[in-house]
C-alpha cells in the first residue's frame, strides 16, 4: 500500500506532492500526460524545441516540476491512465494502465487533482473540421509548436480566450476576431477583488500587450452562432452575432476563417471522485464540483481534493489548495505537520477571485435559441436537437438520463464529456423545468472512467440481466424511432 497517492500533475498536484514530501510522506504521483505540468504548464517533447513564449509564468512551473523530480520521496507514473476506482472499508483501489501494463494500486490516502476541460456549447456547424476548443488550439501550440490554422477566430467567454489569442499571434497566425460574449463592464462588479489580485492583472496585461501589437481589439457582446464548410469539407467561415444580455441574437455578420477556437469556460473533471463516492455539489455556474472542507478533505476520510475539481479558479488557487491538501494528507498518515494560517489566507484571496470569475462570465440560457432541429448535440453518436425533442415529446423522456437511454446521446467515446452538460440544459428547456442536481451529477459520473482496451476489462466488468435488457431496449428504440 502506498503512503500518499496523488492523481494529476498540474499546478495543484505538483504543489500537493511537494508539500506532502516535505512533511515526510512518501508520494506516488500519477498523471495521464507523458510530461509533468498539466495543461497550464504543458511542455513540448524534447525534439519540438522551446515553447517558452506560449507561457506567462513557465518559470514557476519549471521550478515545481524540477522540485518534484528532485525529491527522492516522490515516485512518478507519467503517461498512466486510471480506468477504474473503488472505495471500500477505507481503502481506495485504482486500476491503472502504465507502460502497457495494468497495475492495481491500493491506498488509504489519496489526493485528487484531476483538473478541468473546455466547456463547449453546440451550434450549427460546430462539428465541422476546423472548429476547435481554445484548449485544443493551445495544446497544439504548447505541446507540439503547431499552429492549428492561419486565420483564427477566438470566441466564447472567459479570460482563457486571451492567452489563446496571444499564443496564436506569437506563433505567426492571424486572429481575425476575438469575441467575448459578455460585456466588459462585468469586472467592475468586483473592483476590490481585482486590486488584491494584482498578479492576475499583470497576467491579463501580458496577453493584452501581444494582442494590441497585432492591432486586434476584443469585441464584447458577440459570439459565433454558426459555422460553414467549404468545398473541401473543412471550415470556411463563421456567423458572428451581436447578442443581448440573455444571449439572444440581434444581428449577424459572416467572417472568413479556417479555424474557430470556441470555449465557454471549463468543466471540472470529477469522474474519478464520483466513482469513489465523494460528495458533489452544483456550483453557481451550473458545473459539478467536489465538496471539500477547510483541510481540502472530501466527504470520505483520507481522500483529499484540490484544484479545479473543487471549483474553477485558475492556477494560483489550484496551487494554494494543493499545498493545503498535501499538508493535510501528510498529517493524515501521521506526519507532524500543520496547515498554517498563511496558507488558508492565500487560498481565501484566490477563492474570492474565482468567485468574481463566475460573476463576470456567466453563460446565459439564450444560447439554446442559436440551435435548429438539425444541429448535432452529441457528436460521437450524431444525435440532433430533433432527436432529443422526439425522445421527450413522443417517447416520454422526463429527464436527461432517460433521453440519453433513448437516443444514445452521451454514450459515445467521450462518454458525455463534450455534450453531457448541454444535454441536461436542452432537455430541461424542452420540459420547461430547471435542471436537477441529479441530472447534473448523472452527466459527469461514469463507472468506467476512461476508454480502455477490451482485453483489460475482460472478466472485470459484469452486467446484470436487467442491464442487458435495458441496453437492448435502448438499441431497438434507436433503430426504430430515430
Question: Residue spans of the language-model regions?
Answer:
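Residues forming the flavin
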Residues: 1-413, 417-482
Amino acid at each position: 500500500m502506498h503512503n500518499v497517492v496523488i492523481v494529476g500533475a498540474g499546478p495543484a498536484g505538483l504543489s500537493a506532492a511537494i508539500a506532502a514530501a516535505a512533511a515526510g510522506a512518501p508520494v506516488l504521483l500519477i498523471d495521464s500526460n507523458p510530461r509533468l505540468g498539466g495543461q497550464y504548464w504543458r511542455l513540448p517533447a524534447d525534439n519540438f524545441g522551446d515553447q517558452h513564449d506560449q507561457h506567462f509564468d513557465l518559470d514557476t512551473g519549471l521550478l515545481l516540476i524540477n522540485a518534484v523530480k528532485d525529491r527522492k520521496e516522490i515516485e512518478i507514473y507519467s503517461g498512466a491512465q486510471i480506468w477504474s476506482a473503488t472505495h471500500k472499508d477505507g481503502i481506495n483501489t485504482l486500476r491503472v494502465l502504465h507502460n502497457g501494463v495494468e497495475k492495481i494500486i491500493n491506498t488509504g490516502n489519496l489526493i485528487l487533482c484531476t483538473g478541468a476541460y473546455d466547456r463547449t456549447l453546440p451550434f450549427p456547424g460546430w462539428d465541422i473540421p476546423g472548429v476547435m476548443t481554445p484548449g485544443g488550439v493551445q495544446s497544439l501550440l504548447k505541446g507540439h509548436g503547431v499552429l492549428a490554422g492561419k486565420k483564427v477566430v477566438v470566441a466564447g467567454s472567459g479570460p482563457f480566450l486571451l492567452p489563446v489569442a496571444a499564443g496564436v499571434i506569437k506563433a505567426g497566425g492571424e486572429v481575425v476576431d476575438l469575441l467575448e460574449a459578455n460585456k466588459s463592464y462585468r469586472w467592475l462588479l468586483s473592483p476590490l477583488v481585482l486590486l488584491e489580485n494584482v498578479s492576475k492583472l499583470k497576467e491579463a496585461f501580458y496577453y493584452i500587450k501581444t494582442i494590441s501589437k497585432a492591432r486586434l481589439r476584443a469585441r464584447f457582446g458577440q459570439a459565433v452562432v454558426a459555422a460553414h464548410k467549404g468545398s473541401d469539407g473543412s471550415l470556411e467561415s463563421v456567423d458572428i452575432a451581436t447578442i443581448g444580455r440573455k444571449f439572444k441574437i440581434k444581428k449577424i455578420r459572416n467572417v472568413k476563417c479556417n479555424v474557430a477556437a470556441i470555449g465557454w469556460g471549463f468543466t471540472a473533471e470529477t469522474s474519478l471522485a464520483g466513482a469513489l463516492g465523494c460528495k458533489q455539489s452544483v456550483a453557481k455556474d451550473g458545473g459539478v464540483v467536489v465538496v471539500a472542507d477547510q483541510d481540502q478533505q472530501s466527504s470520505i476520510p483520507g481522500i483529499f481534493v484540490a484544484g479545479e475539481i473543487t471549483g474553477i479558479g485558475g492556477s494560483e488557487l489550484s496551487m494554494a489548495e494543493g499545498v493545503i491538501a498535501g499538508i493535510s494528507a501528510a498529517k493524515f498518515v501521521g506526519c507532524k505537520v500543520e496547515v498554517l494560517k498563511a496558507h488558508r489566507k492565500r487560498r481565501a484571496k484566490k477563492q474570492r477571485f474565482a468567485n468574481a470569475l463566475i460573476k463576470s462570465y456567466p453563460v446565459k440560457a439564450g444560447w439554446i435559441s442559436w440551435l435548429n432541429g438539425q444541429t448535432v448535440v452529441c457528436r460521437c453518436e450524431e444525435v440532433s436537437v430533433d432527436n432529443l425533442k422526439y425522445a421527450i415529446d413522443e417517447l416520454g423522456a422526463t429527464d436527461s438520463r432517460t433521453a440519453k437511454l433513448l437516443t444514445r446521446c452521451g454514450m459515445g467515446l467521450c462518454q458525455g464529456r463534450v455534450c453531457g452538460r448541454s444535454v441536461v440544459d436542452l432537455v430541461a428547456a424542452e420540459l420547461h423545468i430547471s435542471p436537477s442536481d441529479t441530472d447534473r451529477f448523472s452527466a459527469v459520473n461514469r463507472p468506467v472512467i476512461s476508454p480502455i482496451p477490451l482485453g483489460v476489462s475482460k472478466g472485470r466488468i459484469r452486467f446484470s440481466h436487467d442491464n442487458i435488457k435495458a441496453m437492448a431496449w435502448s438499441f431497438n428504440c434507436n433503430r426504430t424511432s430515430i
